[in-house]
Amino acid sequence: MRYADPSANRDLLGNRTLLFIFICAFALVTLLQQILYGRNYIKRYFEFYEGPFEYNSTRCLELRHEILEVKVLSMVKQSELFDRWKSLQMCKWAMNISEANQFKSTLSRCCNAPAFLFTTQKNTPLGTKLKYEVDTSGIYHINQEIFRMFPKDMPYYRSQFKKCAVVGNGGILKNSRCGREINSADFVFRCNLPPISEKYTMDVGVKTDVVTVNPSIITERFHKLEKWRRPFYRVLQVYENASVLLPAFYNTRNTDVSIRVKYVLDDFESPQAVYYFHPQYLVNVSRYWLSLGVRAKRISTGLILVTAALELCEEVHLFGFWAFPMNPSGLYITHHYYDNVKPRPGFHAMPSEIFNFLHLHSRGILRVHTGTCSCC
């Protein structure tokens, strides 16, 4: 019979106790470091909240820095970006005039919306051989008939409007109650004939000054306006006197159907103006955002309108711009506020566009609204 040394059991028990104490101490130190220094600043969510913090407070400077230090979207997990953005909502937003003016000066040099957003008789004279944006080998000869459709000059000038709202169609708008705030803007841009019926007005408003129309909508929903002219006209009437904006010279397929829009409105004696994006403006805007990391086959119409608004308006507010399946609180949302139809994969770079908007918000250049509104 072997003799069992009781001291060996005591040594083993002692070693286990020391190991357990070490693990607990390590866990406690790690937890304290996370609370005191961690990126999420857990104490923010539990301290007594007395309302929005001032824009230039130390807390808000730190929160904005947390967004701006993320140079590319792939640097952080999506949930981490959401946490940082959600924390920043504790801060009042204010326009940084020097940052905004510097950014607008850059846009003026590269793109110049007040002179080239639309084709006009001034920037596209009679006889011009106009190059398409995408079909660069294609040329459209500006004849007398088309020339008469163009306005003599741009109808808008630099910083003409004090406060503008650019309204995207994202599901983030659903239940936002932002309609009154959107309607309170001096000028409102909307994308691609979105529904603004009574069912949606509390969230998206009704005021519209410019609405874009993608020619693919005309082709698919209105049979290229070869027969369905009155239904198309009735849809446009919803936007009252809003100007209609089309990419007629994006590619050769867009031109005829875009020109038909002008004919339809003339036939029904509509007061609505019809404008066409200048293809060189679209090229310049795409190049500019490519330099900031937006790599896509085509930038979105929303991004084009935001770019133009930054030159035409003193203060720009974005609504309905969000490119993720969840809102900042982690709740799943539909792709659009009116349906859940997904976009063609790989065509736009929406997450990259939204990421740039969050940066511009943090720099005080524009304001991105992703929560509920409490206007007026």
From Swiss-Prot:
It is found in: Golgi apparatus membrane. GO terms for molecular function: alpha-N-acetylneuraminate alpha-2,8-sialyltransferase activity; sialyltransferase activity. This is Alpha-2,8-sialyltransferase 8E. Disulfide bonds join C164-C313, C178-C373. Glycans are attached at N56, N96, N241, N284. It comes from the Eukaryota. Residues 1-17 are cytoplasmic. Substrate binds at N192, N214, P215, S216, S300, T301, G302. The keyword Protease does not apply. Its EC number is 2.4.99.-. Pathway: Protein modification; protein glycosylation. It is an enzyme of class 2 (transferase). It catalyses: a ganglioside GQ1c (d18:1(4E)) + CMP-N-acetyl-beta-neuraminate = a ganglioside GP1c (d18:1(4E)) + CMP + H(+). Residues 39-376 are lumenal. The chain crosses the membrane at residues 18-38. Keywords: Disulfide bond, Glycoprotein, Glycosyltransferase, Golgi apparatus, Lipid metabolism, Membrane, Signal-anchor, Transferase, Transmembrane, Transmembrane helix. It is a single-pass type II membrane protein. The keyword Glycosyltransferase applies. Involved in the synthesis of gangliosides GD1c, GT1a, GQ1b, GP1c and GT3 from GD1a, GT1b, GM1b and GD3 respectively. InterPro entries: Glyco_trans_29, Glycosyltr_29_Sialyltrsf, GT29-like_sf, Sialyl_trans. The active site is at H348. Signal peptide: none annotated. GO terms for biological process: glycosphingolipid biosynthetic process; N-glycan processing; oligosaccharide metabolic process; protein glycosylation. Belongs to the glycosyltransferase 29 family.
